[in-house]
């Protein structure tokens, strides 16, 4: 399941950028996933939940992941 590694990389980029901007905690993450990425939204949600539970100092208790899925045309 490459979604776990993918979500880890995405969150590392977000956290790095947030640190530069002085943002301390996340309440929502929005992600656009294309059909050709072969990333499964349900697996990304599961990975997000795991990272959220492992990093309570970064994510609020009610932090959520919103995925917009784009079909290939």
List each model region and its residues:
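Short glycine-rich, basic-tinged beta-strand/loop micro-motifs
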Residues: 24-36
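Short secondary-structure junctions
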Residues: 18-23, 57-60
């Amino acid at each position: 399941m490459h979604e776990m590694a993918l979500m880890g990389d995405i969150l590392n980029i977000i956290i790095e950028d947030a640190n530069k901007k002085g943002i301390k905690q996340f309440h929502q993450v929005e992600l656009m996933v294309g059909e050709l990425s072969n990333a499964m939204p349900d697996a990304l949600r599961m990975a997000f939940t795991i990272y959220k539970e492992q990093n309570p100092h970064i994510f609020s208790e009610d932090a959520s992941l919103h995925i917009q899925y784009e079909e290939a045309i």
